[in-house]
């Protein structure tokens, strides 16, 4: 965002290194970032079973450490990550150009990135009013697609007590296609 990496824009930034992510490990992994020393100390304690030092537990915690193999994979990938982002942005530009050339803008809403931002393009997601029909047609033509997060978070069982009116979300979950 405006030349800054997104994990440094708030008090705590988090990222996933799930294998399908642009900077993905070979297994589950993630990280949290902060510039606040006290928060950093608390975050380290939480991922070390709540330990302040060996066998001295000062808070509830869990085993949230990244294993050495995942760290090694990520360190290796991090060395070429800027080049990876350039390539991903190039592919996204090609998708956009081809869709503009071949598909009516009335049928498809393309993703946009503000001039002062860069995207890592974890997915290239469009909005299509007749998504399921388009998805079927693409599958028949051998083009793989995905619908990410088809059920809004506020409709998940864990949030059953929450009542929200999210009209834009309702529309999006019926239209998004990657």
List each model region and its residues.
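Conserved active-site segment immediately N-terminal to the catalytic lysine
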Residues: 1-24, 53-58, 109
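Acidic, glycine-centered active-site loop in nucleotide-sugar glycosyltransferases
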Residues: 9, 28, 124
């Amino acid at each position: 965002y405006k030349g800054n990496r997104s994990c440094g824009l708030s008090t705590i930034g988090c990222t996933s290194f799930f294998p399908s992510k642009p900077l993905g490990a070979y297994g589950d992994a993630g990280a949290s970032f902060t510039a606040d020393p006290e928060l950093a100390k608390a975050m380290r304690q939480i991922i070390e079973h709540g330990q302040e030092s060996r066998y001295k537990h000062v808070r509830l915690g869990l085993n949230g450490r990244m294993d050495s193999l995942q760290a090694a994979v990520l360190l290796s990938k991090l060395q070429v990550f800027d080049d990876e982002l350039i390539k991903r942005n190039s592919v996204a530009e090609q998708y956009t150009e081809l869709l503009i050339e071949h598909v009516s803008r009335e049928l498809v809403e393309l993703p946009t990135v503000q001039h002062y931002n860069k995207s890592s393009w974890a997915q290239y997601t469009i909005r299509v009013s007749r998504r399921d029909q388009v998805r079927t047609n693409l599958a028949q033509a051998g083009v793989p697609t995905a619908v990410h997060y088809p059920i809004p978070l506020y409709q998940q069982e864990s949030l059953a007590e929450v009542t929200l009116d999210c009209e834009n979300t309702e529309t999006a979950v019926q239209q998004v296609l990657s």
